[in-house]
Amino acid sequence: MKNKFICFVLMSSLLFPWGKTGHRTTGEVAEHFLTEKTKIEIQKILHDPSLAIASTWSDEMRSNPDFRKYNPWHYANMPLSITYANSKKSSKGDIVQAIKLSKSKLKDNNVSFEEKAFYLKYLVHLIGDIHQPLHVGRGEDRGGNDIKVKWFGDDSNLHRVWDTNMIDNYQMSYTELSSHLLRSYSSENIELLSENEWIDESQNKVKIIYSNVKNGDYLGYDYIYENFDIVKIQLFTAGYRLAGTLNEIFDE
């Protein structure tokens, strides 16, 4: 029994912590832009109405074999030469299809609160994912996971650098980082747009990311200096758009 527990802990630590601070930051930022009616509706659905906590639920559930079929929901891989609209869609679903489905389920009065909780938690997570450019990267390198780099001398990969490494370098909690973003950025010039436009934005960014890094590169302070502002803006934008999406669902 002890060995099984140790094995479970090790597997969990290897598979599921990536991006936790970023996702929770996005959820925390979103809370500041929710209407009162939206907050009330969310509280009816979730036992814990914190969007920050809800944001990592879908990653935490990946250890459950029943949830593996939802793994394709977290990304949409396509060649850089074509847009999502012109790409071949996966029969297993992708991040855009999953966002559309989640929104539809949350608007449907015939859907139970239990089922709505499932789709709400996924929606909170996926709107964060779609604003991380490597989640719409190339299929051939699994969104940068197969581009191996050195991060301050340690083994990493391009996807992890954007998901986790740059954020962790600042050693902020998600509450500290969200407070910093809310002080630093304004929602005034951010358009809410749609998931189809979000993925186009991220694809434009990922083209630049790919062009600046190759397999085996050493990344450190220079890379943070050149790119971390993009990470912060994406986290803030994702939070604002998450709130806008939820307000549209629950308060319009």
Task: Tell where the protein language model's regions lie, with residue ranges.
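Sec-dependent N-terminal signal peptides
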Residues: 4-15
